[in-house]
């Protein structure tokens, strides 16, 4: 069935077939015309030969009748000779016309074949177009296969850009946190607190350590617990021997006994950095101008905030030796600060 199936006819196929058949038919017609004219010329030549023979015979008869003295035979022979001569002249004219026709035909054949070369070029152009069309379906799948990886790489580049943007945002957020932490660390106004506040501001735990002074007790207790949970896995191995024995009992006693918090502060201070020291000094100075409830609330926030600061020795090993010798000095300064807090706390109660 596939062998008998005809190809789909397109204008290019039709043009190729018509141009091919036109050249073939033209060449065939020219050859046939030349053959026919040659046959006609040969036929006329035969007829002329026969007419000449008859004329020769008629002339011999006329001579014989003239010798015999037969007048009727002479007249009949003369009529036949005249007819044959007319026919012979006609044949000669036709032969001349046929020869002229053959000469013109040959000239026309040459001209038409020259013109038909343009038709042959059209046929060749149509054939090339059909061949290129047959070659295109073979190249298209290869071109599509080559285009798909290019599309994938183009699609991968936009996918890489959103991945780069989230990476840039976390880098920008710590910078914003440090900018927010530095103004909170500056009001301490102590030379010893500033060098310790800047390294502490670089980590994510510095923000909860600086902000609890301006917020209620519940918020500072919730934020450090959430943020130190991410910082503890890296900081626990180094911070356990220093921070846990001192900071955690102090935090527990601060949560259990609000009245005993000024006494629990010196226990939490030796493990904390100068950041915690300056933060503890600030609540000690503020209760003179605020009600009695706020001094009791702020010290409750500080030991809890000291826990993120206590985990920092894991990230800054060089600060540990500086922090441990200053523990007795911190204890003495905190002890001197707590009587001041007690006296300041007693003044508002008497005023109330």
From Swiss-Prot:
Native source organism of the sequence: Pseudomonas aeruginosa (strain ATCC 15692 / DSM 22644 / CIP 104116 / JCM 14847 / LMG 12228 / 1C / PRS 101 / PAO1)
MF annotations from Gene Ontology: DNA binding
Keywords, sorted A to Z: Activator, Alginate biosynthesis, DNA-binding, Repeat, Transcription, Transcription regulation
Protein name: Transcriptional regulatory protein AlgP
Keyword check for Transport: no
Gene responsible for this protein: algP
Annotated segments matching region Disordered: 128-352
Coiled-coil intervals, chain numbering: none
Domain notes: The C-terminal domain binds to DNA. It is unknown whether binding is specific or non-specific.
GO aspect biological process, one term: regulation of single-species biofilm formation
Biased composition (Low complexity): 138-341
